[in-house]
């Protein structure tokens, strides 16, 4: 090959490695309404400038690679590349920054949470230039959110299906979650539902084990809820966990639940995967099933404060993938800051339009347009003394789930359910009469316990429990 030919072939392409910030750090960029925006908490390695770290995140989660490649010339990087458009220091933290990245909409497949996460967080978290990386929030543009079905039914449709209005819903996880036979499990479900609960629940790891195969559990639970419905005159439900080792098996279980005529099924959306969850959500809408979502494995992803993903991102992803309920923490007994953060992502689940509010961890204004909302589920260590606070904090559009707070009643499951229902009805009535639940909550519970021996017994058992 002649020197002249070599020169012509190399025009516009220079091999080698160059700083990411030269291409992917664009502080003058004005974001578009169609961009997906991300807020990353970045902890660079020593000696790596924050601009280079932010640009590296934008590059490695979009079009970039570690070296210049000649095929860059075959496309428009300006059209497809992610851009780090702003960086701010995290107050009170050493060497931590919030890097804001804008992604063009064309980088993502329509209606696929799987593809969105594969692009944004699929590879960049192992990047050497970063000591730690956490995705704090995403802004999903309406042009992208409208490509998703979202929750199978949403809050209003669920209330209409259940014919329950004006109060939070009550639930209970059956315990022990592993080891019961299907018939004994169904008996526990029946006792809770006839006592006044709206729902009972399979726990996250109740699938189809040797001691209780899924089909037997489904049959006995269906018998229990129909019997409880006949006795109480109320519509009842049990979250039948359809999570399985394959999508085909998961769908088989959901189809059987529909054939039984039950109102709701359940899925572990993180361990089951977003593709499986979206498929199940579509089936549930088409076939009139509500879908309860458990967040098993979430703490593996969201517990570290400087690495992983915040739960608000997982909550947004669930609303897009599809689910009518999702566990979201209790707030009760937590620090005020954690309370505000929790209520921030609760609003992201329920509301149509959420304003940016950094004090609540909301980095971007989010407009869900007409996508149905998701009911947050409060569960974990709660009992009748928490009922006023839970009613005030979460409001009517919530599920308050008392596991041990029902099954731990000294008189049994049904009296435990009665105690919770009486406590809830007392709190709702007091609120509607204008009383202050935060200030008068304990007095409201004491007043109700005077005419409910079940509630009085529960109050005595858990009076010294503090969370």
UniProtKB/Swiss-Prot annotation:
Its main location: plastid. The modification N6,N6,N6-trimethyllysine is found at residue 14. The record marks 334 as: Transition state stabilizer. It is found in: Plastid, Chloroplast. Belongs to the RuBisCO large chain family. Type I subfamily. GO terms for cellular component: chloroplast. The lineage of its organism: Eukaryota, Viridiplantae, Streptophyta, Embryophyta, Tracheophyta. The gene is rbcL. This is Ribulose bisphosphate carboxylase large chain. It comes from Calamus usitatus.
């Amino acid at each position: 090959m002649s020197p002249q030919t070599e020169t012509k072939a190399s025009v516009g392409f220079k091999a080698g490695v160059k700083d990411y910030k030269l291409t992917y750090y664009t502080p003058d960029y004005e974001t578009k309404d169609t961009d997906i925006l991300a807020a990353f908490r970045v902890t660079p390695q020593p000696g790596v400038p924050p601009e280079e770290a932010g640009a590296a995140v934008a590059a490695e989660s979009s079009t970039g690679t570690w070296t210049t490649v000649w095929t860059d010339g075959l496309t428009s990087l300006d059209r497809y590349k992610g851009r780090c458009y702003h960086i701010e220091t995290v107050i009170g933290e050493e060497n931590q920054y919030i890097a804001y990245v804008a992604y063009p909409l064309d980088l993502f497949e329509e209606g696929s949470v799987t593809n969105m996460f594969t692009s944004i967080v699929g590879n960049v978290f192992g990047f050497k230039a970063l000591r730690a990386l956490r995705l704090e929030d995403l802004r999903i543009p309406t042009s992208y959110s409208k490509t998703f079905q979202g929750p199978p039914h949403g809050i209003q449709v669920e209330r209409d299906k259940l014919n329950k209005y004006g109060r939070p819903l009550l639930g209970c996880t059956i315990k022990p979650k592993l080891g019961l036979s299907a018939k004994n499990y169904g008996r526990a479900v029946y006792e809770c539902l006839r006592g006044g609960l709206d729902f009972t629940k399979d726990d996250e790891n109740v699938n189809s084990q040797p001691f209780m195969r899924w089909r037997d559990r489904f049959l006995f639970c269906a018998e229990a809820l129909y019997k409880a419905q006949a006795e109480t005159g109320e519509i009842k439900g049990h979250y039948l966990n359809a999570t399985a080792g394959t999508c085909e098996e998961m769908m088989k279980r959901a189809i059987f639940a529909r054939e039984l005529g039950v109102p709701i099924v359940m899925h572990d959306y993180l361990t089951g995967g977003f593709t499986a969850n979206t498929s199940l959500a579509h089936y549930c809408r088409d076939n009139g099933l509500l879908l309860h979502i458990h967040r098993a494995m979430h703490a593996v992803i969201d517990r570290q404060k400087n690495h992983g993903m915040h739960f608000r991102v997982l909550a947004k992803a669930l609303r897009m993938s599809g689910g009518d309920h999702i566990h979201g923490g209790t707030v009760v007994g937590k620090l005020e800051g954690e309370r505000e953060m929790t209520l921030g992502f609760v609003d992201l689940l329920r509301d149509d339009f959420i304003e940016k509010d950094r004090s609540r961890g909301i980095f971007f204004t989010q407009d869900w347009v007409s996508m149905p909302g998701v009911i947050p589920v409060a569960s974990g260590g709660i009992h009748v003394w928490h009922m006023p606070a839970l009613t005030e904090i979460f409001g009517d559009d919530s599920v308050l789930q008392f596991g041990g707070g029902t099954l731990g009643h000294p008189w049994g499951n049904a009296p435990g359910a009665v105690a919770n229902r009486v406590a809830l009805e007392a709190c709702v009535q007091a609120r509607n009469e204008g009383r202050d639940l935060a200030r008068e909550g304990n007095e409201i519970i004491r007043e109700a316990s005077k005419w409910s021996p079940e509630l009085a017994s529960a109050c005595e058992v858990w009076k010294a429990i503090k969370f």
